[in-house]
Amino acid sequence: MMPDHGELLYEGKAKRVFASTDPDRVLVEFKNDATAFNAQKKAQLDGKGRLNCQISARLFDLLEREGVPTHYCGLAGETWMLVRRVRIIPLEVVLRNIATGSLCRQTPIAEGTAIEPALLDLYYKDDSLGDPLLTEARVQLLGVADTAQLSAIEQLARRVNAVLLPFFDELDLQLVDFKLELGLASDGTLLLADEISPDTCRLWDRRNSNAEDRILDKDRFRKDLGGVMEAYGEVLKRVQGNCPNPRNCL
């Protein structure tokens, strides 16, 4: 069911953001669109929005219970959530626990190498530039964040990793790497925003040793492996087992 909402404020590749009756809250609708390679590859996957919304709600709740501040206020439907309005910082914050993907393409590090402590990478959130990898100096040159803000961003990201790693491990899921987006609330509080789902996390099934079959994330779409919705559904099934009842605002 669609909740009452105001005007469309923003539409991205995977979500729409609408005004709500509270100026400090917005409604987010998760779409069924699947995209990869900066939207060069696209598809409609029926049910994807619901799965990502339900997974994200439960993981935001988990993180809040562990003291990580997020924008999440509650579910507002199968594919909707109410969140705090934030000003998104134009950075994609990536934490890497296991070497794979672009890290292995850009360096001689072997696929599957454990990284401890996790590697934190910052990317400039700009599709027209291809989301380039940034140094700390470049982040400051762009005026995106100063030294103190970068320190706060790293602390929050590493706290998220410290909560999610053992949580997924209990579910026989290996948290390979993940992407976070952060934002500033009206009072200046740094909050975890966007979503946490198989669209933004690489998750490998410890119950399956096959290099392709173990993939339970967006790489199934990127690599044309098939079974995307089955993989996302399996992630929700396991997450639900430990986080059955997320907050909702219905």
From Swiss-Prot:
Q: Which GO terms describe its biological process?
A: 'de novo' IMP biosynthetic process; cobalamin biosynthetic process
Q: What is the protein's species of origin?
A: Synechococcus sp. (strain CC9605)
PROSITE patterns xref list: SAICAR_SYNTHETASE_1
Give UniProt keywords alphabetically: ATP-binding, Ligase, Nucleotide-binding, Purine biosynthesis
Protein name, UniProt field: Phosphoribosylaminoimidazole-succinocarboxamide synthase
Superkingdom of the source species: Bacteria
Q: Which residues form a coiled coil?
A: none
Name the SUPFAM superfamilies for this protein: SAICAR synthase-like
Enzyme's top EC category: ligase
User: HAMAP family from the xrefs?
Assistant: SAICAR_synth (MF_00137)
Q: Which gene encodes it?
A: purC
Q: In which pathway does it act?
A: Purine metabolism; IMP biosynthesis via de novo pathway; 5-amino-1-(5-phospho-D-ribosyl)imidazole-4-carboxamide from 5-amino-1-(5-phospho-D-ribosyl)imidazole-4-carboxylate: step 1/2
Molecular function as annotated in GO? ATP binding; phosphoribosylaminoimidazolesuccinocarboxamide synthase activity
Catalytic reaction(s) noted: 5-amino-1-(5-phospho-D-ribosyl)imidazole-4-carboxylate + L-aspartate + ATP = (2S)-2-[5-amino-1-(5-phospho-beta-D-ribosyl)imidazole-4-carboxamido]succinate + ADP + phosphate + 2 H(+)
The record lists the membrane-crossing segments as: none
